[in-house]
Each structure stands twice: as structure tokens, then as C-alpha cells.
């Protein structure tokens, strides 16, 4: 009589860097939209968003209202999770790892350690390796991006200036990151060691970026994207997707604008499709000239 040995089923990997980065990879090419109600979340999903960001106030309102901006109410987040089938993100304050723990317990798909909220720690960001939920973090330059990756971030977004409806800072930050990556490509090991010191980032990650010619995680763009052309611009500059905050639900026709931005993000290299997507969208959100913003009101300066 022959016998067969049963091999115990191997538990699936959870919470590893490979798994968390793989989850973020699934969002490539898409649009992530800020929403404040389940109804807005459904509009975003129907428009083709790959994920939604659940928060109580969009950045434009946070900027207008002032005060301390904190993690959103758990009931509101759970209401949005229940309303849609696409992934749901939520924001924690920089360095507020307990807010991040709460968000993980709620079952959000991604945590955004966000400069849009008021930082809780002026020295430390959260240790993202301590979580099974993947983190998204903002960056204005390559050094900032690599420091967040070293802390465990599974996705980077160039910061831009949230809540302004002005894409100029998004362009500046994405170009800065891409240009600094290109500069590393021709470096030998000695130069990479010097670059790591200059960037204040681990040598191993700097070397990996030089070899890949890109970040080892997904790179999206955020902050000021308000029109289909804005979204296509960021994609043509090298963003692998876009976040849209106030630009949709502060506009005249949110559902139509949301669908148009998704279409332009997908067909970002086809001017005719972008033109068609841009027709008859109603009023865009009221923009802010970033040059007039006082230093203390520049969200992109938060983080280090």
C-alpha cells in the first residue's frame, strides 16, 4: 500500500515589502480621487478611479478653514469602505503612528502619511515597516523619496501643492525627482556613495535607483491637478498615475470632470482624446497662485 505525505499549505505572504509594493503596482496608470462621502466615492468609482482617498475635508477646505487637520472619523472611513469595491486609502498625520494603527485596524487598503494634515512629529516619520498595510508618502525631491522608501513606503507621490488647483508645483517636484534619478545613471560606485550622503539616503537604495533608472516603488503625482490636460501632463512627464484632490468635487460638474480626468490619464499621449475629454466640463475649481502662498501655508514643505 502506498502512502502520500500531505504537505501543509503555505500561508500567503502578508505585509512584506514585495507584497505591499505589488499592491501599489496594481494602481499604475490610474487616478486616485479624494472623497468625503460615500456618494462621492460612488461617483469616483463609476468614473473609473482605481482607488479613493477617504477624508473629512478636501485639501482646499483644509487650507481655507485652517486649524489642526487630523485623521478622519472612523465611521466616515468605514462608510466609504462599505460603499465601493475599489481600494480605499486614508490619511494619517506625519509621525502619528497611532493614527496609522487605527487606520490599519479599520481595514483601509493604503495609508497616506500626508503633509496635508498637520504633522504630529517634527523629527520622525512613522516606521512603515511595522505595518502590514502599505503606505503612500509624498516627496519633493529624490532624497525625500528615498528616505520614505527606507522607512518602508510602498508608493511615492510627488507632492505638488494640494488644494491650490495649480499644477506648477506638481510639475516642479516630479521633474526634480526624475532629473535626479537621471543624474545617478552615469555614476560609478564612489560617486554613488557621495550621492547617498548628499541625498541623506541609504547607499543600497541609491544604487538600486541608479541601476533601475527609476524608483523601486510606484511614482504617482499629486497636488494641483484640476483638468484632464493637467493629468495628461503629469503622465507625459513620467508619473505612473495621478492623485486628484479638490479638483473634482470643487468643480462645476464633478461626475463629468472625474470621468474626463480618468480618460486623459489613460490616453495621456493622444491630444485629440484629451481635447474631447476637456469639452463642456463646467467651471474648474478656483485656483490659487502658489507664488502668493506664505511659507507657513505651503504643505509641500512639511516632512523632511
UniProtKB/Swiss-Prot annotation:
It is an enzyme of class 4 (lyase). The keyword Lyase applies. GO terms for biological process: amino acid metabolic process; pyridoxal phosphate biosynthetic process; pyridoxine biosynthetic process. The active site is at 91 (schiff-base intermediate with d-ribose 5-phosphate). Pathway: Cofactor biosynthesis; pyridoxal 5'-phosphate biosynthesis. It catalyses: aldehydo-D-ribose 5-phosphate + D-glyceraldehyde 3-phosphate + L-glutamine = pyridoxal 5'-phosphate + L-glutamate + phosphate + 3 H2O + H(+). Pfam families: SOR_SNZ. GO terms for molecular function: pyridoxal 5'-phosphate synthase (glutamine hydrolysing) activity. Keywords: Lyase, Pyridoxal phosphate, Schiff base. In the presence of PdxT, forms a dodecamer of heterodimers. This is Pyridoxal 5'-phosphate synthase subunit PdxS. The gene is pdxS.
